[in-house]
Amino acid sequence: MQKSVFLAAVAGVGMTAGVASAATLDDVQARGTLNCGVNTGLVGFAAPNAEGEWEGFDVAVCKAVAAAVLGDPSAVEYVSLTGKTRFTALASGEIDMLSRNTTQTFTRDVDLKFEFTGINYYDGQGFMVPAELGVSSATELDGATICIQTGTTTELNLADYFRSNNMDYEPVPIETNA
């Protein structure tokens, strides 16, 4: 069953959405709530505030869809998802839509059969290095230990960068950025 897809990107390209199948819309309307997959906590995009209420850009997208489909922007159940769990949750029906940082790729479009919409957020990737190390170029990072969020295109881009520059690195995988 095809699901509506809203994928907001922080690591690459942007917000993507598919046209919801009639069955998904029927399910949402019958349930009276939209199950919206969001990041596990990315301030400015999707994170609970001090009162425990979700806020941010991706949250606003979920609210807009709930308002359009159900007439109530508060009729949203937020489901925290990691880079590794987001696509399984969408494909399995655990969520009705996904609104979280996700890069649109050919493989995700073709193999996962998600329909992406226009990009809503552009970003970039880089390295943060303590100033006292005196590093002025990423090419000086041969042998570095680098934290990287798993299940992301950033993880793949990091491996590609080091491989193409004949450099080694020690990845420190992290599940979430929270």
Model-inferred region functions:
Residues 50, 63-74, 116, 154-176:
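Ligand-binding cleft/hinge of the Venus flytrap
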Residues 2-12, 20-74:
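N-terminal hydrophobic or amphipathic helices and topogenic motifs
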Residues 25-26, 87, 138, 178:
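Short hydrophobic/charged patches on amphipathic alpha-helices used for structural packing
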Residues 41, 103-104, 130-134, 146-154:
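Short coil/turn segments
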Residues 52-60, 81-84, 148-153, 174-178:
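Soluble non-cytosolic domains of exported or imported proteins
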Residues 33-39, 55, 139-155:
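Short loop->beta-strand "edge-of-pocket" segments that line small-molecule binding or catalytic clefts
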Residues 63, 67, 71, 75-140:
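Acidic, polar ligand-binding/catalytic clefts
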Residues 47-53, 76, 86, 143-148:
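Second-shell loop/turn segments in exported
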